[in-house]
Amino acid sequence: MSSKNSLSDKIKITFQYIMPKHAISRLVGKLAAAKMGWLTTKLISMFIKAYGINMNEAKLKKASDFDTFNNFFTRELEEGARIIDNDENTICYPVDGAISQQGDIIDGQLIQAKGFNYSVTSLLGGDEKTAAPFQGGKFSCIYLAPKDYHRIHMPMAATLREMIYVPGELFSVNPLTAQNVPDLFARNERVVAIFDTEMGELAMVLVGATIVASIETTWAGTITPPAGKDIFRWQYPKDGADAITFEKGDEMGRFKLGSTVVSTFAPNMISEFATDAGPGTVTRLGEIYAALDKSAS
C-alpha cells in the first residue's frame, strides 16, 4: 500500500481485503436478476440520473422498459450508435471505457500501475504454453465505468480457439485498487478467450470485480463453473462448420455490472497504438485503436 495514500484511501483498501467479496457479489447478483416491478424501475432511474447515462443511444430508452437491473446494465445500443471502423489494417476499441494501461509485454510482464507489474502467464491462467505466443507482444487494459455500455466486441476478425475460466478474488477494479493491490488483474476471477487471427494470436480477458454479478460470452452464455479453485478449459474447432468465427466489431461478451478487459496481442501484430491513445484516454467502441503490422504477416 502506497505511503502517499490518504487515510480514507488506506481504509478503503484495507476494507477490500477483509470484506466478504464473493458473498456480497452473489447477493448483488441475485438482486440484479430479480424482477421487482416498480422498485426495479425506480432503482434504474436513480442509476441513470446518478451516472448521467445517455439513454438516447440505447435501443430501449426508458427505465420501465427493463424488467431486471441486469437487462438494463447489459442494454443494447440502437443501430448506428457506434460505427465500427472497417479498415482491415487497424484494430478498433472493443468497448466504451477508459484506457488504464497499454504497451509492450517485456520479460513476460504487463504494467498494472506505477510500481506494479503482473505476468502474462498468471493473467492467462498459469499455463506457460498458453502464454508463450504473447511473450514480447503488446497489451491493452481498458476499464469500464458504471455509466458505460457493457457489451464487449471484437477488435478484429478472429476465430475462437479456447476459453479458460480462472477462479479468484473479487477486488474492486478502479484506479485506487490498481495502484495498491498487487497482481490485481491476475488474482481476480476472470474469463480468458484465446483467438486465432490472420496476424497471430489474440487473448481477451474479461476480469471480474466486486459486485460483478457474472460474465457472459456469446457462445457459452453465463460462465458459472462449480465453486472452487479449479481452472476450467474449453477447446473449440479452428475450422469447419462448428468453428466459432467473429468479424471485427461483433459482440463477444458482456459484463453484468462492470469491470475491465485486458487484451494481449502476439508479437508483430500491432505496429503502433493510435497517437491519442494512452492511460486515461476515453475509448469509444469501434473507433481506431491501433495499426496492424501487415509487413510482418
From Swiss-Prot:
Does Lipid biosynthesis show up as a keyword for this record? Answer: yes
Which pathway does the protein contribute to? Phospholipid metabolism; phosphatidylethanolamine biosynthesis; phosphatidylethanolamine from CDP-diacylglycerol: step 2/2
Q: Where is this site: Cleavage (non-hydrolytic)?
A: 258-259
Pfam families membership? PS_Dcarbxylase
Which Gene Ontology molecular function entries are recorded, alphabetically?
Answer: phosphatidylserine decarboxylase activity
An individual GO BP term: phosphatidylethanolamine biosynthetic process
Q: What class of enzyme is it?
A: lyase
Name recorded for this polypeptide: Phosphatidylserine decarboxylase proenzyme
**Keywords, in A-Z order:** Cell membrane, Decarboxylase, Lipid biosynthesis, Lipid metabolism, Lyase, Membrane, Phospholipid biosynthesis, Phospholipid metabolism, Pyruvate, Zymogen
Function field: Catalyzes the formation of phosphatidylethanolamine (PtdEtn) from phosphatidylserine (PtdSer).
